[in-house]
Every structure is written in structure tokens, then in C-alpha cells.
Amino acid sequence: MSVFPIKNDVINAVIAGIENAKRNYTFWTSDELYLSYAPPKFLTIHVAQEIGKLANAPEIFIDATISDILRCSLPNRTDFRDFMKKNYIMDRLLCLTLDERFTHKSDNDSVSRVIMSLKNGVRNVQEEYKNDIEVMCKMLERDKKEDSTLDYAIFAFYLDISSSARKNAQERLDNIIESFDSIVASHKNLKSSFKGGSIKKIEKVGEWCIGCYVIEHTL
């Protein structure tokens, strides 16, 4: 097995990817549009590119299904259906999955380590975001470390608001983190942290920031 990149390097790459997405979109649209107007995959592609530059870069998969991720992370590859049924998980896509990079002997020996949800134009706590956090918690939660190869999950986002908004960016950020914290706290053997959130102000226009909410097991 190859050496997997350390968590902080991955998080920094995610933030750098979103920063690069913002620079590119602003330049490409000649300062006419903000990043929040970009299509959903815009963040994903830029983040994947930055992670791909890391030393010991992992295998990177865009829009992998939850069933495939579980198949590549549970001890028994055939247990994913029972796991999903037991935890009330509907199959759908996750933005990015990072797998161990090695020479494969078959098309069924991948090992998933990190899962990510990337959201653009985040301004308030939405059910969609809370559902992503809940699902990722269920995928990470376990009684023993060896019950899954998944190490952590990242919910990364770009937030921007106009200067006329009722709530400022810091209030919105605090509400988002508080909401996510309550979900993580309802699951055993999990902890969370937040990186980013440095709010940038644009005079007479508004505020923006980039955040990475990280969930990991404590075993």
C-alpha cells in the first residue's frame, strides 16, 4: 500500500482548490459574476486538481456512489447493502472520494479513506447540508477502528452574502457550525473540527469565506 497524504495537507488542498476556483471564475467572467454563480461541479474539479498535486496523491473519484464507497471501506465487501438498510441510507453520489493509490490486482480491491461534500453559495443551514453531515457520520461511525477504512469526512463550502443581508457572514458561519456540531454529537466515537472561515469583506458589496468542516472517528 502507498503512503496516504496527511489530513492537514488534504484540507489545505481543499481550501486552495476553492480559492483557485474563485480566482478563475472571477477572471473568466471579467469580474461580472461571483463564484456562487458557478455550476456545481466547478468547485469539485478545482479541489480534485489541487489534491492531485499532493505528494503521495491518493486516487480521486468524482461522484462515487455511497454503495461503492461502502463496498470499498467495509471489512466485507458484500455487507454494504445490509449496512445501508440498517442505517437508513439511500444510495446517491458524494462529490469526492479519496482512495489509497496502489497497483490493483482486480477491479474490486479499492480502499476508500476520505469522503467529501462540496457546496457552493452556502448562506444558511439547509436540510440538504444537514443530510450530507448525517450520512457521512453514519458512514464513519463504528465500534472498532477496523470496522471501516474511512478516516474522515469533509464538508467544504464557499459562502458569500451581500452587504444588505440581514445576517452577516460570521453569524451565518456560527449557525452552520452549531447545526453540524449537534448532528456529530448524536453519533458515537466521532469528533469534528473546523478550518477556514476567514471572512473577506468587499467594500459596499458584501462578504465571503471558505470553510472546511471535518468529521473523524476517535478510535
Q: Where are the language model's segments positioned?
A:
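Domain-level recognition of nuclease-like catalytic cores that cleave nucleotide substrates
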Residues: E141, D147-L219
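Conserved catalytic cores of phosphodiester-cleaving nucleases, focusing on short active-site segments
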Residues: L96-E100, V111-V122, M136
